[in-house]
């Protein structure tokens, strides 16, 4: 045995823990779908209004343009108060790739819609689905997502898309294809976007009958999909790629996680369903307000608060007592020992832990897991007999670590 060098121990510094927050995919559903309706064709409200009233679990996006049916827009604005979305479809519905006024067509019209509707406008839809680099750059200035129509792409949870090129399935008479998109989204645990125009069966081949439209939306419900507006799903999706990477830092009596908004045009409120490692039995707070867990143990937090605190231990796989408040508490002793020979180090498991007589205590104790460079990775409470299983259960990368018994101060080299 030898003493772990002071140089290694000094590397711990201020404790930091990676990724204690994990977003629940698609708000707790097996997939998501956004139904979008273009051009303020009044048949959309006339023929689907009752359906939306009776089915409050579906919310859609209405993309509006000043170039088509602008006189109907005021009839759509109250839908935003009911949870539906007002989206930007450009000022004149022109081919934007040939426009010399992209700011007026895209950004200025967004603010015009917001002023008249009182709603946040965060999603854009390119007219005719025509775009180029200049169009995308202008869209990205004030919108978090853009819809085009290159087909029913299925966007998987952990694969970040190009936000200015979210493709959709433009309905052209094939109801069975649209229904198939719903089952495929569930199968792939993915998000898909549907594009519709008139809901009266007319519309130069782009219209759909009310019964067919309702049957597609009902199919989405039958598949268990999250049926939410495009901007809302995009905000949830974008938030996931940020918050799941956010690191926690130790604070007095617990830990704090902070993150940044991925875009200046994010909605003012982005409710996010998350799991928080190390929060069981602790108090979760945002801006001083306590967040109660849901029945399944998840938390619905406000992403746009950009921070979260857990009063209690730092993230751990299990804990029945408070963890050390700082890394200096964890490694206060300089006589901690580690094995000196490879024979003492397990090559594929931690079975050697229980074999060491120095680790024979039956009493629960706190174990700290360090990287080989001395960085504190995780902590957990266990007896020496259960330490092996607890260590294996940790969600950390495979590799070599040092496992320290904080009661005896012994350190053991282990492999996951």
Predicted features by range, described:
Residues 3, 379, 398-416:
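C-terminal tail/sorting-segment detector
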Residues 3-35, 43, 47, 210, ...:
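N-terminal pre-catalytic segment of deacetylase/amide-hydrolase enzymes
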Residues 19-25, 55, 60, 68-71, ...:
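C-terminal domain-boundary segment and adjacent tail
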Residues 30-33, 42-43, 54-145, 149-166, ...:
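Metal-dependent polysaccharide deacetylase catalytic core of the NodB/CE4 family, i.e.
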Residues 290, 354-361, 366, 376-396:
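Glycine-centered tight-turn motifs at strand-turn-strand junctions
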Residues 295-316:
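C-terminal beta-strand-rich structural cap/linker in extracellular carbohydrate-active enzymes
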Residues 314-351:
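Ser/Thr/Gly/Pro-rich low-complexity, disordered linker/stalk segments of secreted
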Residues 318, 353, 369, 374, ...:
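Terminal processing/anchoring signals of secreted or surface-associated proteins
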